[in-house]
Amino acid sequence: MSVTPSIDAVRDLRAASCGPVGAPSVTSELSENIILTSLDDLHNWARLSSLWPLLYGTACCFIEFAALIGSRFDFDRFGLVPRSSPRQADLLIVAGTVTMKMAPALVRLYEQMPEPKYVIAMGACTITGGMFSADSTTAVRGVDKLIPVDLYLPGCPPRPEAIFDAVIKLRKKVGDESVSERIKIAQTHRYFTVPHQMKRVEPIVTGAYLSADTQKAALSPGAGLPMAAELNTSEIDASPASQPSSTYES
């Protein structure tokens, strides 16, 4: 048996449904289906999940990074997609020794990368010059003298697990950035390439020491000693083997 509502109940229902819309209340069901965030968090989340590295390997450290491409470590889960062009990359991984001759090429690759961009210095040779920092005259003592570095990864060479740890720390840095702060920093902390004005230097070792008086005095006691037959140039020049032959044997 149905109950017919009264006229007053119908009027109250019409007034409640046709009145002005009030502020909606966020229920527990709505908060579970909608994520409230900011523009910075959304932008950083998209960037940290799609880091595209440009691999700049010059020595043995790059072999350890090449192991990440295999299925054992599977670095694709971090969104890392290796790129061969600097214009498509936002992460530069420098692995190995950087020499004076390779320094301009490295700086050019960094300048061709779009903003925002990050750099990971991988290995002791990249960070400080490594075992080449003591005696080598061409090794760069630290890649941070050429380009700004965001994260240092020590080791000789670092293991693939250490590279994962470096990527995770870089993702945390990317997630804490702000668009407005990054614009201000870009205006006050700009990176300019320093042109190297190189000039020619005369060689130090020219062979002039052989004609010095001290060298002549050291060689004078052996001036009167007999010379071995094998070192006698006059006999070598007169030998038949040293003369060119005009006939050919078939």
UniProtKB/Swiss-Prot annotation:
One GO cellular component, as annotated: respiratory chain complex I
Residues annotated for [4Fe-4S] cluster binding in this entry: 60-61, 125, 156
EC id: 7.1.1.-
One Gene Ontology biological process: electron transport coupled proton transport
Composition-biased stretches (Polar residues): 231-250
Topology within the bilayer: Peripheral membrane protein
Catalyzed reactions per annotation: a plastoquinone + NADH + (n+1) H(+)(in) = a plastoquinol + NAD(+) + n H(+)(out); a plastoquinone + NADPH + (n+1) H(+)(in) = a plastoquinol + NADP(+) + n H(+)(out)
Function: NDH-1 shuttles electrons from an unknown electron donor, via FMN and iron-sulfur (Fe-S) centers, to quinones in the respiratory and/or the photosynthetic chain. The immediate electron acceptor for the enzyme in this species is believed to be plastoquinone. Couples the redox reaction to proton translocation, and thus conserves the redox energy in a proton gradient. Cyanobacterial NDH-1 also plays a role in inorganic carbon-concentration.
Protein name (database record): NAD(P)H-quinone oxidoreductase subunit K
Annotated source species: Prochlorococcus marinus (strain MIT 9303)
